[in-house]
């Protein structure tokens, strides 16, 4: 009633589920100067504090920004998703400082592939396809997007490491038409999402 809803929308207090991705970007960009300052003091300190906040939110998902439309708060909890942002900034700073991407450690590559295979089997909708449920952990594992559960974070980190440590993947991304188009989509991810 009245124009109270306008104020709620402008203050990001009325966000329908998946539509708070834009406000999430704004909050992350607004918090960037703080993270950058912490990185200038000590890169490990910045990552440690960011990781501690992420872990706190994973232990208590109720720690979230308020949302008038959803009593659980923002669908994409900025207090959790900031850690992925922090990991990306730290990885970028690290590779820029070294002048190259991550070293390819065979044991770590194997671990990433094994985890991603497990993740694919666990996430596949077996019963929707009329197949027997082959998920190793069944319903016991339900990774949340809202507070960036560890399983979702591991997915992203494993894929990131496999790409950033592979000369072949970098060459494919730089030289192939598909790789260049994917890079173009990535540079315009907000517009693509909207």
Name what the model sees in each region.
Residues 1-194:
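Alpha-helical transmembrane segments and their immediate juxtamembrane cytosolic regions
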């Amino acid at each position: 009633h009245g124009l109270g809803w306008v104020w709620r929308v402008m203050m990001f207090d009325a966000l329908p589920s998946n539509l708070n991705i834009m406000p999430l970007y704004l909050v992350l960009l607004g918090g960037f100067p703080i993270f950058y300052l912490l990185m200038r003091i000590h890169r490990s300190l910045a990552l440690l504090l960011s990781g501690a906040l992420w872990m706190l939110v994973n232990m208590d998902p109720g720690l979230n920004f308020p949302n008038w439309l959803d009593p659980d708060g923002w669908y994409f909890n900025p207090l959790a998703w900031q850690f992925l942002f922090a990991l990306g900034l730290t990885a970028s700073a690290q590779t820029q400082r070294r002048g190259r991407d991550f070293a390819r450690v065979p044991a770590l590559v194997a671990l990433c592939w094994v985890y991603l295979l497990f993740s694919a089997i666990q996430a596949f909708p077996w019963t929707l396809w009329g197949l027997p449920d082959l998920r190793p952990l069944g319903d016991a594992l339900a990774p949340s997007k809202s507070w960036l559960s560890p399983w979702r974070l591991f997915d992203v980190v494993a894929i990131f490491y496999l790409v950033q440590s592979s000369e072949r993947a970098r060459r494919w991304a730089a030289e192939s038409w598909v790789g260049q188009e994917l890079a173009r989509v990535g540079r315009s991810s907000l517009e693509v999402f909207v």
